[in-house]
């Protein structure tokens, strides 16, 4: 090994001779010239006396097999030519045709070899296929002509019997409009055709015994099952003697035995059409379910995508102010009088103040000062859960009350048509101490919106037809028709005792709702009703915790219809003239807009 590496080194250094792949000895462990060069370099470094690289001349390290396989895998296979071997035909004795004998085969040795390029081979295959297709179309044309002459075999014709394939010309067949590659397939050849091909190939004598053997094989394939009738004797039953089970696909086929009379030791198989039909239906249903599941998966993904896309925009809408206007706002005291819904301000801390303002503005109607969404209050979780439950109950009750009120309203609409006015409070009379906490209330004006015009009615008719019952909800007085059943107001009566944080109760009935929100300390104080027969029974409303000033107290008292003076004279420096001036400033320049209901 060392001497061989030394010789190679000398040959490489001289430059006269260079080792090639063909020169490598078969007994050499090297498999290529590149590996030999690597061995030379390793031997050269060992001979130089390098102490770092020890000598590898005493043993050989073969190249990695994995690396060699990887190098072979990177190469792509390219065919440059096609080699075709031709064999002569011989009698085969290997196939079983559907009829006759004289099977086709080939000799054990090829008689010629021919090479084609890829293009030449493709053209040659197309030519051969076209020739075979031409012969096939000629035979079809010949058969159609014979059937036409003999009238589908009912009439004998000498002319039809004398016709051959050679009588059919290429003009009679449409070969140009037929795709050869798509139409081409192997066709079975009849017995005469096979005999002619064998004689053309040089077969002088055709073995006739093959014909009898093929007939026996075909009969054995056609004959299946035993010949037993009703009963099977294991000693005479062919199925039992062959060691196979008796098979019954239908009545007496292929085996004629019955289930009770079969004595085959191997057993018995009976075709069950119900089981096959059930299996078929289950398979079809399973495939349909899988197809529906695949069709529903993209749809659900699209729905989730829409929900996720609209999710951020839907978030603030849940806390924004909803402007829900009832169908008719009817006032029983004075038909043409306007109702002023006050936008009060709360003196609470943080987000709780904003949410309570949201609830008061929602109950009192649509206010132009509540155009931006408010953040939810940081109340206790228990209170929020109670609020959600009560909201669901209130929505159900409101729907029922709305349906009942519409039915009751149909009998009184023609008798008591009243005007309705929707007032928007601008907050011009808001106290100066609240400008910092609610700055967006300070730049609006009081607007009166005429909802609809009706024929005024007398207070006596109104009180008789629409006797109301007072309901206090979070310090707000709700006027609802008396015709409703008292069971629907159970939850409303209970709300005066429970503390809610900014619950929204949509107005589902057409009654006027006057909301007087109160603070936590004054949550039990009710508002004054709009009807004179109830003002004597209820105390006057004090707005100490909301208006935070004596001017607003006098103004609210004036709106209630009496000249009630505050119980604290020391805290009320304003005179009656100033109160009247403040009242006139709030209601001056009304803007009336008719909204169809």
Swiss-Prot record:
It is found in: Nucleus. Residues 42-52 have a biased composition (Low complexity). Detected only in the brain of 15 dpc, 18 dpc, newborn and P6 mice (at protein level). GO terms for biological process: apoptotic process; positive regulation of apoptotic process; positive regulation of transcription by RNA polymerase II. Residues 348-359, 378-401 have a biased composition (Acidic residues). One of its GO terms (molecular function) is DNA-binding transcription activator activity, RNA polymerase II-specific. Pfam families: CSRNP_N (PF16019). Residues 22-64, 348-407 are annotated as: Disordered. Keywords: Activator, Apoptosis, DNA-binding, Nucleus, Transcription, Transcription regulation. The keyword Nucleotide-binding does not apply. Disruption phenotype: Mice display no obvious defects in development, hematopoiesis or T-cell function. Deletion of Axud1, Csnrp2 and Csnrp3 together causes partial neonatal lethality, suggesting that they have redundant functions. GO terms for cellular component: nucleus. Residues 53-64, 361-376 have a biased composition (Polar residues). InterPro entries: CSRNP_N (IPR031972), Cys/Ser-rich_nuc_prot (IPR023260). Binds to the consensus sequence 5'-AGAGTG-3' and has transcriptional activator activity. Plays a role in apoptosis. Belongs to the AXUD1 family. This is Cysteine/serine-rich nuclear protein 3. It comes from Mus musculus (Mouse).
